[in-house]
């Protein structure tokens, strides 16, 4: 059952109802429900859905070709287009006379495998934007890539989008829709522990206590949540070890830059750069006292609920949890 995202669906449906070319950019952290949102939106509509893979250009071209051919003929074909440009132009041509959605999920994987993909898209958008009824959706989980290579001023696709949505975790009210049997107090506890990320909420069972849920997930080495924060960092940053150290320092109570620098054992200039990236990822938040300009009084706190809980309790007890003694 699909829950929430009413505002996002309304925006996408308004774009779909227009009689002209539309280009929406969706981005947000992994597990936040971007793919589920796209699936819900395109259900019952004429759409080509293609998810990029972390492979080479040839593999992505073959997969893209299959998605197009399956839409066009209803069958999986054993042939591929000559190039990604030819495949894209074919889709733009299909949308000359009718509304058609092309949803490209995990766009960064494709763009990294084909250095000319963004420029090719730019060229085709400029060529067809006045005649095509295509609704193009680019979706990505690498927030830094989407912001720097799709939304940024110097990006080839800058100025072409007609909408952009940063998909965020649910707030508390939306989170409550996932649970029917938790008491209000337990729902508040669950939200405080895992936040509003759909993938984590789906692993919480309202038929058992909050304590049992913690044991089944955070304290269970076979659970996907057990190593989730570290896995997410590895997908987003190049030096996860130092990021881990900084997050651990903040989660354990170091809130001022000098304290963080001392705990981590790095210069403040280094910590500042890494903290800036963590803020961009929505993992850390910088708070400045009311009436003060940004200064040494600024505090750093863990913004993400699940990261805060995990880094506060799991690393220090890893050996106990690993041997099943938690």
Task: Pin down the residues of each PLM region.
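Phosphate-binding site recognition
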Residues: 1-325
């Amino acid at each position: 059952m699909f829950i929430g995202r009413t505002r996002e669906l309304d925006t996408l449906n308004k774009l779909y109802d227009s009689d002209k070319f539309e280009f929406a950019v969706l981005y947000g952290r992994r597990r936040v429900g971007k793919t589920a949102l796209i699936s819900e939106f395109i259900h019952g509509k004429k759409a080509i859905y293609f998810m990029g893979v972390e492979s080479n250009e040839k593999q992505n071209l073959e997969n893209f070709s299959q998605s197009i051919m399956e839409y066009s003929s209803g069958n999986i074909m054993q042939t591929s287009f000559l190039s990604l440009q030819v495949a894209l132009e074919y889709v733009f041509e299909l949308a000359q006379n009718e509304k058609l959605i092309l949803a490209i999920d995990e766009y960064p994987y494709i763009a990294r495998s084909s250095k000319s993909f963004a420029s090719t898209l730019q060229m085709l958008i400029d060529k067809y934007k006045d005649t095509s009824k295509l609704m193009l959706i680019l979706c990505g989980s690498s927030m830094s890539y989407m912001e720097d290579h799709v939304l940024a001023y110097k990006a080839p696709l800058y100025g072409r989008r007609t909408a952009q949505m940063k998909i965020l975790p649910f707030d508390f009210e939306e989170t409550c829709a996932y649970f029917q049997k938790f008491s209000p107090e337990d729902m508040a506890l669950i939200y405080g522990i895992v936040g509003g990320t759909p993938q984590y909420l789906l692993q919480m069972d309202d038929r058992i206590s909050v304590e049992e849920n913690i044991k089944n997930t955070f304290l269970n080495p076979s659970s996907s949540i057990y190593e989730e924060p570290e896995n997410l960092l590895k997908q987003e940053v190049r030096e996860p070890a130092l990021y881990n150290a900084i997050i651990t320092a903040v989660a354990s109570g170091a809130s001022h830059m000098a304290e963080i620098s001392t705990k981590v054992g790095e210069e403040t200039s280094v910590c500042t750069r890494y903290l800036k990236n963590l803020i961009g990822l929505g993992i850390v938040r910088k708070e400045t006292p009311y009436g003060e300009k940004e200064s040494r009084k600024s505090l750093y706190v863990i913004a993400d609920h699940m990261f805060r809980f995990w880094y506060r309790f799991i690393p220090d007890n890893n050996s106990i949890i690993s041997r099943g003694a938690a």
